[in-house]
Amino acid sequence: MNAKSLKIILLILSVVAIKPIIADESSIYCFVGDAGEVNPTQAKVVKALANSDCSMVWHLGDITQLGVKSIDDPELQDSFLTPFKPFLETGIPLYLTVGNHDYKGDPSVYLKVAKDYPSIFHPSNFYTKTFGELCFFALDTTIFDKLYYFYKRGNQ
């Protein structure tokens, strides 16, 4: 993430964080990211999530290392759906945010995945989810990086 993207996120968070957050004390919010490489560590993380007390899990991006081109792409099964199956079977909500690696394919595939799996939530690349007075943002900053470099190249 570049400095400009970080400043935008911090600005948004500073506006949102003015009011103290009162969250449900019984809720446990869990976060994972860059989970697209199939290896023993990924399996341990998925198992831990499946056996956890998480109220929800938010995937912060890079769902697969190579991106996926379609709903039928073997990479989707091999790198995400099959390894995450033990967790998906728990019914704990999984909120997806796409990352730069997901743009190596077609990131809109995850919109279709969310329709096929009731526990996966991904209505768009930018969305919010509120739990009481606590609000989480899904901010796909990859598009801003691409626009930044596009315009930077055009001005040289």
Task: Label each PLM-derived region with a short phrase.
Residues 1-8:
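Bacterial N-terminal signal peptides that target proteins for export
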Residues 4, 13, 25-26:
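Intrinsically disordered, low-complexity segments enriched in Ser/Pro/Gly/Ala and basic residues
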Residues 9-17:
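Bacterial N-terminal signal peptides
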Residues 17-75:
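N-terminal active-site segment of His-dependent metallophosphoesterases
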Residues 69-156:
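Extended active-site neighborhood of metal-dependent phosphoesterases/phosphodiesterases
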